[in-house]
């Protein structure tokens, strides 16, 4: 039976592994929040926020969403974001900053598209408005 193991296809690497794992996500998230906080349309959402804690949770979330080894332990997206006035326009801006941070970190454009595709279904839990109105 050991011979059969040699002919099995290797499991495809997760996006998490392909982009460099936890350390790469820390770099991306740091750059991402520099961009988000510099955006006048978004910075107000973070007034009074413990950014170190938020960045840690964001890394944990992205790691879990992209096939990392550990589950996300934060509160549900809807619970965290409800009542904050986040619109689909804001969601699109954030997605654009994420794409830019990933690209700046050297993530290939095809992988950036995969990541945005993995995050897009969360739009209705984070923002108010129609999910189809997200533009990046």
UniProtKB/Swiss-Prot annotation:
InterPro entries: Globin-like_sf (IPR009050), Globin/Proto (IPR012292), Globin_bac-like_CS (IPR019795), Hemoglobin_trunc (IPR001486), Hemoglobin_trunc_I (IPR016339). Keywords: Heme, Iron, Metal-binding, Oxygen transport, Transport. Heme binds at residue 81. SUPFAM superfamilies: Globin-like. Its cofactor is heme. Pfam families: Bac_globin (PF01152). CDD domains: TrHb1_N. Homodimer. Belongs to the truncated hemoglobin family. Group I subfamily. Binds oxygen cooperatively with very high affinity because of a fast combination and a slow dissociation rate. This is Group 1 truncated hemoglobin GlbN. It comes from Mycolicibacterium paratuberculosis (strain ATCC BAA-968 / K-10).
